[in-house]
Amino acid sequence: MGCGHGRVEGVSAKENCVCEILRDIVDAQNDVIENCCDTSCEQSINDLLGETDPGNGLDTVPVILYCAGDCKPFKGFGARRGNGLGTIGKLQSSFIFRVKSVTDDCCAVLELLRDPNDPCECDHLKDPCDQSTHNLENTGICITVDLDCFCHVTCLPAISVFD
């Protein structure tokens, strides 16, 4: 797992390591839902799979992505449907995501994760350190991204976002 792992020169040279890691996270999360370092992607995946504590109830590896080029943290935006058909709810933002799926061509569906007690104003989040991580929950707000646009992924410790 990770950048360059298992690659043979000339084979799969275009494989994106961010894409590869996120694909591994999706596989691990799907295994849990249907049934080194203290903090790393590998550790978070192992925790999620119960390799360190079986039956731990964890279901998500939260991730922060960094844009290629400027290497700045990526902030996603979205909104729930409003109360009536054809209406849009309040715009929300997050630097922290749950990976829902990754396609063969490295597009991913990401769900915004937020602490429901954290203010939802999009302007107050200037970088990931401004975002509360104490009680992250799934929002149901998903975005689609091209993983070739990212150069780095930070995995936070595995958590449970589903009851």
PLM feature segments, named:
Residues 1-163:
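Short glycine-rich, low-complexity segments
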